C-alpha cells in the first residue's frame, strides 16, 4: 500500500533549516574539506544498503553528484565554488540529525530537505557539472580522445562562465 503525503515548507520553516545549516557550517569549519567529503561518502555508503523511501533515494543521487562535482579532477571546480559546495555538504558531517535516521520512513526526511535546499543553492554549479559530464561521456566514443585535454578545457571554461552568469542573475533576483 502506497501513501502519498505532500507538504510545503513556509518561509519560517526554511529559515529554521537555514539556521541549522549555519550551525553545521560553523561546526564544519573545524573539519578539513577531505573530512566533509569523507563524511558525506560514508552517509551515502551507509544508505546504499538501506531501504530508504523513494523521495530520499532521489535526493541521494543529487548528493552523489555534489560529491562528484567537488572531487572531479577533470571538471576543476574553482575554489570559491568548491567552498560553497563544501558549506552545503557540512550538514552531513554532524552525526546528530534533526530527525534521527533510525526512525522508519521519516528518519532521512531532514537529510532529504537539506539536500534539496543545498541543490537549489548550487543549481548553477550542478547544471554546469551535469552538462560537463554529458559532454565528456559523448566525446568518449572510440577515437575521440585525441586532444582530450583541449576539448575538455574549452567546454569546462564555457560551462563555468555560464555558471557564473547564472549565479549572478540568481543573486540579483
Pin down the residues of each PLM region.
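Membrane-inserting effector segments that mediate pore formation, membrane fusion
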Residues: 83, 88-115
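Terminal, membrane-proximal amphipathic helices
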Residues: 1-83, 120-173
Amino acid at each position: 500500500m502506497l501513501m502519498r503525503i505532500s507538504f510545503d515548507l513556509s518561509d519560517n520553516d526554511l529559515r529554521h533549516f537555514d539556521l541549522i545549516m549555519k550551525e553545521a557550517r560553523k561546526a564544519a569549519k573545524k573539519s578539513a574539506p577531505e573530512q566533509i567529503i569523507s563524511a558525506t561518502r560514508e552517509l551515502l555508503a551507509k544508505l546504499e544498503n538501506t531501504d530508504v523511501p523513494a523521495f530520499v533515494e532521489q535526493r541521494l543521487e543529487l548528493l552523489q553528484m555534489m560529491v562528484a562535482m567537488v572531487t572531479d579532477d577533470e571538471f576543476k571546480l574553482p575554489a570559491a565554488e568548491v567552498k560553497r559546495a563544501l558549506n552545503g555538504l557540512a550538514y552531513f558531517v554532524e552525526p546528530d540529525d534533526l530527525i534521527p535516521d533510525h526512525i522508519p520512513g521519516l528518519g532521512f526526511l531532514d537529510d532529504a530537505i537539506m539536500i534539496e535546499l543545498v541543490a537549489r543553492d548550487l543549481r548553477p554549479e550542478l547544471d554546469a557539472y551535469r552538462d560537463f559530464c554529458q559532454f565528456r561521456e559523448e566525446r568518449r566514443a572510440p577515437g575521440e580522445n585525441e586532444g582530450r585535454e583541449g576539448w575538455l578545457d574549452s567546454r569546462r571554461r564555457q560551462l563555468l562562465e555560464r555558471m557564473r552568469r547564472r549565479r549572478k542573475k540568481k543573486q540579483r533576483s
